[in-house]
Amino acid sequence: MCTVCGCAEGETRIEGEHHHHGHDHHHHEHPFVRRPAPAEAAPPAAGGPNLHFGQGPARAHAPGLSQSRMLRIEQDILGKNDRYAAENRARFEALSLFVLNLVSSPGSGKTSLLTRTIELLGRRRPLAVIEGDQQTDHDAARIRATGVPAVQINTGKGCHLDAHMVGHALARLDDLEGGLLFIENVGNLVCPAAFDLGEAHKVAILSVTEGEDKPLKYPDMFHAADLMLLNKTDLLPHLDFDVEACIAYARRVNPDIEVIRVSARSGEGMGEWLAWIERQRGTRLRARIDALREQARALEALL
């Protein structure tokens, strides 16, 4: 996992900028350099014919790194990322900008779902997209074809967006006050779960072509998400996919996760998805209004 491997160092390119961004949150020794194994580095736990490398406090394995060393590296990386995320969140709040982080495996239909969402939302308020991929700007071009501005972040070898990248991309977007910002993360059900970008919610998109047990195989992502969009439901008649089992698996990992069945092609669930966006946006704005009123009362008490 990239909280210990430093896979993206120096690889990121934000479209329109003429230099690459090194990630200061990845400045640490690479675990794949051969060195004597520390005493703490235990062999993987075995259960019958299976090997479990995700045991121990770090819940990960890297040759030559102890569990305590891996934990320190992870805390350093995520601590720096969280500071950038807090800065992003403050900027989003100042703009009354509602931000969603869309996460999924490759091929889940994120971009098709997003373009259809944009078309249905219309121009009632400002919209923008930050696109994350290892290479190309194909998805950003699809978004721009809808008339909505998009900034492409190419992560190179990196397998996720981080808050520092998003902060740079946000600086390239204008006139978003009171609007919606969608962040389409790199297709990956592992690493994006750990990285807060400053968003209001993570939305996990799972297509019915992937298998209903994905929430159990990749629990961190579904635990981090507030909503699961079960996508490509128009294909269900052609697949052996147990919808109820999938939802049960997701709620085993995260009892509070909401689930909406959607299809960009047939339109199923799109109204419910848009209503969820409006409801969550309204809840967040009302919470900010309440906080501002409380601040105003505190100031009035000083008069």
UniProtKB/Swiss-Prot annotation:
Keywords: GTP-binding, Hydrolase, Metal-binding, Nickel, Nucleotide-binding, Zinc
UniProt region (Disordered), positions on chain: 18-63
Residue span of region G-domain: 99-260
Keyword Repeat: no
Sites where the protein binds Ni(2+) 2: 159-160, 191
Swiss-Prot/TrEMBL GO biological process terms: protein maturation
Domain of life the protein comes from: Bacteria
InterPro entries hit by this protein: CobW/HypB/UreG_nucleotide-bd, Hyd_mat_HypB, P-loop_NTPase
Keyword Cytoplasm assigned: no
Binding site for Ni(2+) 1: 2, 5, 7
Biased composition (Low complexity): 36-49
GO molecular function: GTP binding; GTPase activity; nickel cation binding; zinc ion binding
Role played: Involved in the maturation of [NiFe] hydrogenases. Required for nickel insertion into the metal center of the hydrogenase. Exhibits a low intrinsic GTPase activity, which is essential for nickel insertion.
Classification via PANTHER family: HYDROGENASE MATURATION FACTOR HYPB (PTHR30134:SF2), HYDROGENASE PROTEIN ASSEMBLY PROTEIN, NICKEL CHAPERONE (PTHR30134)
Family, per entry: Belongs to the SIMIBI class G3E GTPase family. HypB/HupM subfamily.
Protein name: Hydrogenase maturation factor HypB
Protein species of origin: Azotobacter vinelandii
Gene transcribed to yield this protein: hypB
